[in-house]
Amino acid sequence: IANANMAAAIRLVTVAKGANPADYLLVAFGSAAPQHACSIARELGIRQVLIHPDAGILSAVGIGLADVVRHRSIGVELNLDQLSLSHVREQLDRLEREARGEVRREGVVPEQIVATRSLDLRYQGVDSYLTIPWPTDDDFTTAFAAAHRKQYGYLHQGRQLEIAAARVEVTGRVASELAPSKRATVSQPTSRGTVRVVFGGRMQDTPLYERTELTAGDRLVGPAIISEPMSTTVVEPGWHAEIFSGGELLLTDSGEHAAENVSYAVADPVFLEVFNNLLANIAAQMGVTLRNTASSVNVKERLDFSCAIFTADGRLVANAPHVPVHLGAMEETVRHIIAANPSLAPGDVVATNDPYAGGSHLPDITVVTPVHNAAGKVSFFTANRAHHAEIGGIAPGSMPPLSTNLAEEGVLIRNLRIVAGGESRLDELRSLLTGGAYPSRNVETNLADVSAQVAANRQGAIDLIALVERYTEPVVAAYMNHIQDAAEQKVRQALARLPAGAHTFTDYLETADGQSVPIAVRFTIHDSTSKHAATIDFTGTGPVVAGNLNANRAIVTAAVIYVLRLLVDEDIPLNHGVLRPIEIVLPECLLNPRPGATPETTPAVAGGNVETSQRVVDVLLGALGIAGASQGTMNNLLFGDTTFGYYETIGGGSGATADGPGASAVQVHMTNTRLTDPEILERRFPVRVRGFSVRRGSGGAGRNRGGDGTVRELEFLRPLTVSLITERRGPHPPYGAAGGEPGAFGRNRLIRADGTTVELPGIIQLSVEPGEVLIIETPGGGGFGKP
């Protein structure tokens, strides 16, 4: 388990840098690392491991031999051209002189001082940069293209490059050059005896060697143990070790490994944890790939996406810790795709954003990829869902506060095969995005992000195939089922700890026209050994509304899975097994509207995904009485014009529990996204961040206080359309539990250029002018227990 987790951490770091760990040699240092090195290297596909003669104290050795280094950098923010390069060169000349002076004052002679220069380059309109060493021919364009293609897998043809910053590193060489270590004539050392060691579940007699007695040229065949004063090296079966002239150990994988013999008829607790982590880490790597290759702020900076792995019949197995409202709903999407495409071929990829086929709302595009085995049969699916901040509709940002039907919310994508047999069909998606009554305002970014979603699924497929090659498909498939079984048992145990019987609760949504619409639940706990250990019945919930706070079964299911996951209070994945012991009763209502024949006659759902999902969590937790309500909203803010749309959600207070106070200024429950960095927000969009702070005292009083909300102030720099979808502005505050007081309502207001203040409702679309300031005060969380 430990080795698998360490390998996963290494893989995440290397994938984020666009590197394949299998292309490198693994250096093991520290007292324990050589014990794990062979296993970790094999997990990563690395064939060789290098162990320094002072591996156990290598960090201390390194400090003693370290060079004297000084770094200097300067912000540039200029387009890349000859004029800007000339300007940057002059600035770096000055910085280099300063740094060289500091290094000389450390006692390093000028002849031992070297300097290297680099530029932080990025495409115009993109926030992340790559650091490019200064080419001898000054051809940064070619060097950047090579680096970008290596890390991200694509280029933005024809887009202007800009210099974000310039850097110089001045190094004073202190340590003398070491002679290169070489192979020596092969010899066979004599062991000091044998010890009994378990490898691959089997006890083996293993030779024991003292490293101090090994000489250059000695070659050992694993399994073997090499002991030394500061460390111990384990040479696993299938590896051999040789000693170089400098005393280094080079371990090499012979490649003679059969698929691991893992018993799978019954779950082994160790391998259950191993596979759980392996699959979750594949999903996490998908997320890294998606973030790296995407173009939009919403994906790269706000991380508004989720990645997951599914069985051949579409059951959710594993996911990365992304956005709960995405993760719990994607299973229904994948199952709809399977039903509509029973014969997906290798190289096919399907996209959808249909809220009535497992989707959440139109900005959330889901990309689904089948993973075929060697016989051409679908074995698994990889899928991800990403929020596109612009997908068309009657308002920039594609979440119009006042939409009344699905057509007004953007472009509907239904079961579109965007890759067929490995051939891109994005032109069909382009035609869809540019057509219709309300086309997307930013088609190129849509296409770039969808391409990134395809790449993320491909990464997941590659990793799943590698997992099958290592363990065999029957083993992987069996442990996917075992993981779901384990999740089911954990949920049953959690439900058994709750009081039996029916627990009811009702809370309310506040619509744009001032209505209070109930969401009611009856959470009944049965015998934990029965087929359904609990029934969650939403009978009594209000009817379909004219606005866009309608949700769907997938969103409700996501909220239920999330709350069940909270009850377990252990680190288990959100997967299909969580729902097995649960019966969900969902009549036709605002949580389960009936679609119309066309988008124009289909109920709107833009706010249901973000706001109604939060209220469903509130009523479920309220029924159980285990926490005060959290802020109960995502505080959705959108602004834009005919050329762009921007979207963010704003954190607030979380509810207190019997165990402690609520957290302040956090995203809660069904969202897990970040805010865009102020520097990036101000550079990319016509807005200035005037303030962002904790709203002190907004959490509800109680034995444990609710968390405080936030105050966000934005000044607009040009005429824009602004949309707000923000619940808990009154008359229903975030409730307290067990006698705790409710959290404070949220509040929205606009400061006009002349200084007058306009109070704004929770759901509104308005026009703003340059110099006007929007202030959003988010709700606090409810308290727990009497104050």
Q: How does the language model describe each region?
A:
Residues 1-5, 9-21, 28-787:
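C-terminal, non-catalytic interaction/recognition modules in large multi-subunit enzymes and RNPs
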